[in-house]
């Protein structure tokens, strides 16, 4: 399973490890994914999603319904 957020499409970024001598080696910054259940009051059911921690903060701020609707318009959910 790829490490991609179900709602925002966030995926790993590539960067550098930089030593004190400024030597650079490639590395990967992975997404902080969490498997979480959300309750949809409109449909009276629970859904399980793999979302980034930053997405959970967005859901707490805007609500699950608004975030799901935005994810559908951006094409992350069918």
Curated annotation (Swiss-Prot):
One of its GO terms (cellular component) is ribosome. It comes from the Bacteria. One of its GO terms (biological process) is translation. Keywords: Ribonucleoprotein, Ribosomal protein. One of its GO terms (molecular function) is structural constituent of ribosome. It holds the Pfam family Ribosomal_L28. The keyword Glycosyltransferase does not apply. The keyword Plastid does not apply. Belongs to the bacterial ribosomal protein bL28 family. This is Large ribosomal subunit protein bL28. It comes from Flavobacterium psychrophilum (strain ATCC 49511 / DSM 21280 / CIP 103535 / JIP02/86).
């Amino acid at each position: 399973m790829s490490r991609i957020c179900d709602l925002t499409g966030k995926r790993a970024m590539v960067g550098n490890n930089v030593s004190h001598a400024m030597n650079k080696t490639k590395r990967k910054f992975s997404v902080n994914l969490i498997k979480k259940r959300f309750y949809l009051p409109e449909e009276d059911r629970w859904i399980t999603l793999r979302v980034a921690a930053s997405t959970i903060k967005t859901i707490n701020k805007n609500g699950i319904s608004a975030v799901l609707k935005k994810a559908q318009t951006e094409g992350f959910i069918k």
